[in-house]
Amino acid sequence: EVYFRLFSYVRYLNQRNIDPSYTDSFGVERSVQQRQDIQLAKFFSPFAGWFLTPKFRYYLYVWSSNASQGDPAQVVGAGNLSYVFNRFVTVGAGITSLPTVRSTEGQFPYWLGVDGRLIADEFFRGSYTNGVWIKGDLFQKLKYNAMFATNLSILGVSASQIDNKMDTQSFALQWLPTTGEFGLWGTFGDYDYHEKVATRAAVHWSHSLEDKQSQPGTNAIENSQIRLTDGNVIFTPDLFGKGTTVNTVDYKMMSVDGGVKYKGLSLEGEAYWRRLTNFTGVNTGGIADITDTGYQLQSSGMAIKDVLQLYLSGSQIFGRYGDSSEVRVGESWYFTKQRGLRLNTEFIHVNHSPVGYTAYPMPVGANGNIIHVNLEMNF
């Protein structure tokens, strides 16, 4: 059996109202690119199904981030193979998203906005990587996922760059106490229009010993660099002082999320905690452990059932090297009264973003107002 999907969107992006520069926590002034462009931003085509027996599954795809043309991993061919023993146990191997936060549980692209996480989610999460995993139901309304992997983000990273320790682990527990589900693929928002109150609560715990050689490029697709809260990549030479170079760092991260949906309305939140320890490298003995926290909150409502969704979202990040925040207001017009086509408009007011790359609606250091309009196709 073969199942073919196609996802793509055209994006108009206007960053002209953000500041042209910012000063990081070390007093260094850095320039910020103020983009205004139209891009066929992404092309995603998965092939999925089973072979010989419905228990043996494959999920293979081609993924292109056209805003990142010329950058590492602008085009990716990836996927995974799995075997379903029963509803309690599925074992898989290959490339998939680490279950570090809710948005990497596999519901992409069913988010409130188009292909753009809030800055807190983007800052703390892991990404796509090679590994093995086991997942399934512990009980009827309690699901688990455990993955053992090579690093936090493999896309754009050669096998010759990663270490030989397989020292990345990520675990997730998801509880769906009322209805036993939370919409199609666990999507954000309530386009499904639940007639009964749907609820969820989940916890994620992840650990990785990260090496500077195994980090993706700063504009690699699905970039997941380890950054300080001022936006600096932690492996930058001389960042903590002249002659200082971090080679490895221990990353520990936990997130807790919960949400409720009812008749087109949704309220969903997530809290994050990250700790960076055990720095190794040249002159790293004086670097103290780093703890950062943050949260995001997303609310939405179907103003017109099946047609118009409105949403209001926000997030904050708190850390020794600076705090960040944002507010987003948006709408999605499903002009065919189906989920497969929508016209999305989103306004972002951001204060000192510590994350950003070409495929993301804002650059590192963004401070000000951003608007983007997206025509999304997903079938």
Language-model features: where?
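Acidic surface patches and DE-rich sequence motifs
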Residues: D24
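Flexible, glycine-rich linker and terminal segments associated
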Residues: G180-Y193, M377-F379
